[in-house]
Amino acid sequence: MKSHHILDASGVFATMVIVVFFVAGMLSTPSFAQEKKTEEKPALDTKFENLNHRLDQLAKSIDDVLWYDKVGDVANIDKIFIVGPPPAKVKNPTAMGAKNPVKFWSYVFIPQKLDRSKKYPLLVLPHGGVHADFTTYHTHIIRELMAQGYIVVAPEYRGSTGYGRAFYEQIDYGGLEIEDNHAARDHMVENYDVVDADRVGLIGWSHGGLIALMDVFEHPDDYRVAFAGVPVSDLVQRMGYYNDEYRQQFSAPYHIGKTANEDVQEYRRRSPVTHVGKLQTPLLIHTNTSDDDVNVLEVEHLIEALKSAGKKFEYEIFEDIPGGHSFDRIDTKKAKEIRLKIYKFLAGYLKPPHPFSSLADLEKAGYK
């Protein structure tokens, strides 16, 4: 499917450079300095926050164009606008449209050499980050999945960056974002004839790993297999080893609105470790002892909880692999070897038409 963009990549980049220089110039002008002295700090904070969201939107526009350069030779790329449940919180519940479903974008990648008379496995790939988005950081993973014959949908669930402040503040970490992710799955199954509804899998890292776990726990009949890499697993434990700035993202009024200390049960409800008893689907979990984001102890807690619940699953705890939190998503030989393990696990259940049998297959597919 062709994209309709006003600017090419170089044009968008030039626009961003102009905006950045304009902002820098604005901040250094005497009039702005005077305004800074006289205006209330909360109002200034709001202006800066709104400006940050505008820059995020511009960065998103640039990255959307870059997808065509990065994977356009192997994938048909689309971006679809779909809906999830209504907002978790509404400032004015009686306002017009207050209870409308939340609208969000999702990326769709379909192999170019796909035979439209056949059906193919689908992978749902939620991005990570408390507030983040799906970007060309995933280029090699998408190329590798296209080569194997997977269709991929990557939802920009509520709270993702690049879509403005209002959408950012719709975040519902471990809550309705899970249903957004599942809505992307349902949309693909219902609207794409080439998707095999009996061969749908989940794959995610970090916060995306949490979403993969929670979705497969809540909707076991809709997935054949799931992979969770370095997944956020226990929010109560996590709040204990993170700093105040991180914790404040969760206790913000538009989010959970309370600290873990004030409402332990709410944080437990949003944690995969609380729901391990629901697992019915083949699952692979990876973690790394040198992870600098999701402490290995957090994932080990999840693993032990699954064992205690008598669940069958597979896992591997890697010892001090270079790359920390991103150890299996970077471009080192070891990272690619680990991705090959993941792909072989998924292929055992999803039966893609062109599964990788060697590291050479992966490297040929993922790297130009």
Spans of model-derived segments:
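Active-site-proximal cap/loop segments of hydrolase catalytic domains
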Residues: 82-86, 157-368
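N-terminal targeting or regulatory segments adjacent to alpha/beta-hydrolase or S9 domains
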Residues: 11, 17, 22-23, 27-78, ...
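N-terminal secretory signal peptides that target proteins for export/translocation
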Residues: 1-11
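Generic detector of N-terminal low-structure segments
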Residues: 15, 23-24, 152, 329
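Cap/lid segment of the alpha/beta-hydrolase catalytic domain
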Residues: 74-104, 109-198, 205, 240, ...
